[in-house]
């Protein structure tokens, strides 16, 4: 099952986008619909709202007077938090019931108005944000929903900012134009990204990126942070730390080209802990690569942990690796044991290359040579680089020893 979190500001067009995805074949779980369901007359949700905000939020027939509740609940932050504290747990429980009832190979789009504000984005393998300019949203709310302009502005101001939404968005769909334009964009995203992603997940396949160096993408840091947040959530207590590593983690050098693949390292206390992550990471969008079980061992393995320093035990280079099923964001997820040489070198390598422009230039030259000689074959690309890495391992640790580096 591929679960997609969908959100956007009030008036941006969440319902329209949900409808477009439903026409494509998605199962829609609408947070607004559920939010109404859990506060119907006779529910514990409505009783809790009355206790918190008073009986004057009820209509004569005992149902919820939504404008009256909104006037109180959006008056200040404390009132809004009270509202969210009552409604969100009930909505979450009902959402879980619905999702548990659908087929396992479904694409489930969860329309959640406050996905960003409630910190739920890392729970989803993919987050879609529908966007419209504030003035466009304001006009829709006033003209189509009959809101007073002051109320509409207050509702907009009470929600997350565009910057906060961008920070969690894997896909950003502009709905400032016509309904037909939004439908076209939704269908394109569905066919080019969502369907392949769902297929890869159901078959436990990964999305492979071309073996091609590209200029640094200014979006890499933000993309990596979203992945880190997602993996921390999926790994829970098993992850001692989660880091952006590899070439895309190097800051500030506009000439340092890299493959368009994000590398992430999850540090765990043991390989047994890594093996407990197979299903949680699959659910998060990252199937395991069963055929890769170790890094290439280096002689005189080094570590800042004394019992692992200057060792020759090849078992200390064992690891687990997962990769993204999302064709829109190829990612490698290396799971290594805390203090083992491979875990330490992944962290050291980024810091060393960041600090040493000559080493950075050397590595770029090796990568360009490997790209040319590999002719699109990832195994050949890795093999061409390996002799350089054997020497780089020693150079990096010489730098670490001279600077007092710690992970």
UniProtKB/Swiss-Prot annotation:
Residues 3-201 form the DPCK domain. Keywords: ATP-binding, Coenzyme A biosynthesis, Cytoplasm, Kinase, Nucleotide-binding, Transferase. InterPro entries: Depp_CoAkinase (IPR001977), GrpB/CoaE (IPR007344), NT_sf (IPR043519), P-loop_NTPase (IPR027417). One of its GO terms (biological process) is coenzyme A biosynthetic process. It catalyses: 3'-dephospho-CoA + ATP = ADP + CoA + H(+). It is an enzyme of class 2 (transferase). Residues 196-407 are annotated as: UPF0157. It is found in: Cytoplasm. Its EC number is 2.7.1.24. ATP binds at residues 11-16. GO terms for cellular component: cytoplasm. CDD domains: DPCK. Pathway: Cofactor biosynthesis; coenzyme A biosynthesis; CoA from (R)-pantothenate: step 5/5. GO terms for molecular function: ATP binding; dephospho-CoA kinase activity. Catalyzes the phosphorylation of the 3'-hydroxyl group of dephosphocoenzyme A to form coenzyme A. In the N-terminal section; belongs to the CoaE family. In the C-terminal section; belongs to the UPF0157 (GrpB) family. The C-terminal UPF0157 domain is involved in the proper folding of the full length enzyme. NCBIfam families: dephospho-CoA kinase (TIGR00152), PRK03333.1 (NF002879). This is Dephospho-CoA kinase. It comes from Mycolicibacterium paratuberculosis (strain ATCC BAA-968 / K-10) (Mycobacterium paratuberculosis). The lineage of its organism: Bacteria, Bacillati, Actinomycetota, Actinomycetes, Mycobacteriales.
């Amino acid at each position: 099952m591929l679960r997609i979190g969908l959100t956007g500001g009030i008036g941006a067009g969440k319902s329209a986008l949900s409808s477009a995805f439903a026409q494509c074949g998605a199962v829609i779980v609408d947070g607004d619909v559920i939010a109404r369901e859990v506060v119907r007359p006779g529910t514990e949700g409505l009783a809790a709202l009355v206790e918190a905000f008073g009986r004057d939020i009820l209509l004569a027939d005992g149902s919820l007077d939504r404008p009256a509740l909104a006037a109180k609940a959006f008056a200040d932050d404390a009132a809004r938090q009270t509202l969210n504290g009552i409604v969100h747990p009930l909505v979450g429980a009902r959402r879980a019931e619905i999702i548990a009832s659908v087929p396992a190979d479904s694409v489930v789009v969860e329309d959640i108005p406050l996905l960003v504000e409630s910190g739920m984005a890392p729970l989803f393998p993919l987050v879609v944000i529908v966007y419209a300019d504030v003035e466009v949203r304001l006009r829709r709310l006033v003209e189509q929903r009959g809101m007073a302009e002051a109320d509409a502005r207050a509702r907009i101001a009470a929600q997350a900012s565009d910057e906060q939404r961008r920070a969690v968005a894997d896909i950003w769909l502009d709905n400032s134009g016509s309904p037909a334009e939004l439908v076209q964009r939704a269908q394109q995203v569905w066919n080019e990204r969502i369907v392949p992603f769902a297929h890869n997940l159901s078959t436990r396949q990964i999305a492979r990126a071309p073996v091609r160096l590209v200029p640094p993408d200014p979006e890499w840091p933000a993309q990596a942070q979203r992945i880190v947040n997602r993996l921390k959530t999926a790994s829970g207590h098993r992850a001692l730390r989660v880091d952006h590593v590899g070439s895309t983690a190097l800051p500030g050098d506009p000439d340092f080209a890299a493959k368009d693949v994000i590398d992430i390292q999850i540090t765990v206390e043991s390989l047994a802990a890594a093996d407990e992550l197979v299903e949680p990471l699959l659910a998060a969008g990252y199937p395991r690569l069963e055929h890769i079980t170790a890094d290439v061992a280096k002689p005189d393995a080094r570590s800042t942990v004394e019992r692992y320093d200057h060792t020759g035990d090849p078992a200390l280079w064992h690891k687990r690796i997962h990769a993204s099923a999302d064709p829109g964001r190829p990612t490698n997820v290396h799971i290594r044991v805390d203090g083992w040489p491979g875990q330490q070198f992944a962290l050291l390598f980024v810091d060393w290359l960041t600090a040493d422009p000559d080493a950075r230039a050397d590595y770029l030259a090796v990568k360009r040579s490997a790209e040319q000689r590999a002719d699109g074959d990832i195994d050949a690309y890795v093999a061409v680089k390996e002799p350089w890495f054997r020497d780089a391992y020693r150079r990096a640790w010489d730098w670490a020893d001279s600077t007092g580096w710690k992970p």
